[in-house]
């Protein structure tokens, strides 16, 4: 049994081997790389040709074409009752477009939206969405039909003017292109993303496009600049303003370009004696509600300042009215510039004139777009004329037969009466009067009423008209220039019927209309405060009146426990502000970019402005009127290290920040001061020691350097400040208990770097710790802020200049539990400049 089984197994193996060999003979070995490439290209071309790109001739993608043809087939013309959108979508899906219903309905909705299409192709009834991005109602609720304009796309389609191809299941045919009496691609544009390419064609004004086409027909050697005399530029359904003509020229010349779009704004006076910016037209594609929310967010973040209120008063009657109400005294142009910069009130439209030409994607310039449309119309009118000619000849042929019958009516009647049947009568008539089969059949079908003399006259007149029409058609086909004349006449009628005024305004170069924000900013001194929790604000320094030494001051913020003003300084709104953190990170910004708020406001979080790490703290700052890359600064750390560096290393810091100093463990950056060549620099410690050194003795270093030793400190001492000393300036010191004094800089001798320094104050329980040391001129003023956010402004010369060992005098009266948190200098030259 075992032997028999082995023989059977061997037989099966041989059969399997033979079968495998036969299969392998029929297997083609191909490269997977080539197969992937070819399959992907096949798929890509299918997407490009069958879905994503418009045909240059009728300007439609397949889905648009199928929707219009399905409506035409269902007789949904502009003068017929509306029909449920679901019915049209169902027809399109069942007969022509085997894709999702959402894609078809979404396309049909867009064809009915007056903010999406320059010239509507679908007349919708019901909720078809809004410019606020509200979704349309479901297709079972809405109704639609073709617009009169869309019907022009299908004119003469029944006259064999375009090629029909089988649909997806070969059950019927559909047009491969529409006759398109109107230049749809130019007037409505197109958008689509294919595989590896995209089209983004803007809409245009019908009158302008028609005028350009007419000019091209008369001057086919015209250059693009000649055509641009008629087509000024895109014309968007949402209107708006197009800034600059260079992008338009580039797009019309090369097929690609970028244009800048802006909303149309008007400035109105409100009932509360404020100015309001009213948005009346939006850039194409901008959603109003999204824009509204974006502006509100930017106002909250402090990126847009001076806005009191934002509200939407848009309606069907009033149109778009987005109101941006400004605060009193705010420069409107500054707010406008901020809106242009940060919101979609200004956008860019990238033009890509990509369309299918003979089934292949091609980027087209303006002249080519016009040329291919004219070529298509020539072909359509030629085929239409040939069809009309054949129909006219066929009808004339029949009428000629009827006239022969009427001329020989007695004999015709006799032949019919004597004939055995219809076929015999037809044959006899054909032989007797030399008629064709169609003529003979027409005579047999002719009713008796046509035998009257009046009917004979009508037939003769109709035949004469047909002969004239035949002559016209033959002449038209023999003279191509006459076909072009027909195209011109039809286009002019289209323009008269549907043409309207331009909506989008085109004005000159953007640079000609932009106003430099810096030129519009009021140059004034402002007091800038930063709280312990990182809230920043600016208020006019003039809002703090000058008081006598020893006063209480006025409320300068909203202190809450440990949340109080920690830093205070005065600067011009046009100054550059450099901010440094304890970790040695540097930022810079313009002072006017700091949110302008009331004195009692706590401010805006600085994290909305600067890219600060969670535990990072601001420890020092300075301002300069000009950004001079060669300007030197000196940085001082808590452990007495100093470093000199040029501002050029911080040029890229801006609001994202950059590391300005490499710190050792447990060290912190505490002070930064700009210095000029020849200045002296003084470092002060918490224990009351000051070291004066010469700036020239400190070498400049790169951004990554850690610095060098500046002052020697006792174990329990730390460095608290560092200031450049200019001629005529003295030091001003203030402690946390409000005790302070001025010291002449002459009291401090110039020492070498690394020394211990000289006493400038002896802190004790009465004075409290040293809070701030600054340099001040006799004519300057100072501002002192306390932890309960009281601020006092006094003249510097009201504080006596005392010796190094003197304790000082009372500068500010402090309430119980409060202490001084910072001191700011208001330079006299700023007051004079203001």
From Swiss-Prot:
GO BP annotation list: DNA topological change; DNA-templated DNA replication
Highest rank taxon of the organism: Bacteria
Classification via Pfam families: DNA_gyraseA_C, DNA_topoisoIV
EC number(s) from the headed UniProt entry: 5.6.2.2
Residues annotated as catalytic: 141
MF annotations from Gene Ontology: ATP binding; DNA binding; DNA negative supercoiling activity
Keywords: ATP-binding, Cytoplasm, DNA-binding, Isomerase, Nucleotide-binding, Topoisomerase
Subcellular location: Cytoplasm
TM region positions: none
Residues covered by the Topo IIA-type catalytic domain: 53-520
Keyword field contains DNA-binding: yes
Assembly and oligomerization: Heterotetramer, composed of two GyrA and two GyrB chains. In the heterotetramer, GyrA contains the active site tyrosine that forms a transient covalent intermediate with DNA, while GyrB binds cofactors and catalyzes ATP hydrolysis.
The protein's role, per its UniProt record: A type II topoisomerase that negatively supercoils closed circular double-stranded (ds) DNA in an ATP-dependent manner to modulate DNA topology and maintain chromosomes in an underwound state. Negative supercoiling favors strand separation, and DNA replication, transcription, recombination and repair, all of which involve strand separation. Also able to catalyze the interconversion of other topological isomers of dsDNA rings, including catenanes and knotted rings. Type II topoisomerases break and join 2 DNA strands simultaneously in an ATP-dependent manner.
Name the UniProt record assigns to this protein: DNA gyrase subunit A
Provenance organism: Brachyspira hyodysenteriae (strain ATCC 49526 / WA1)
Lineage: Bacteria, Pseudomonadati, Spirochaetota, Spirochaetia, Brachyspirales
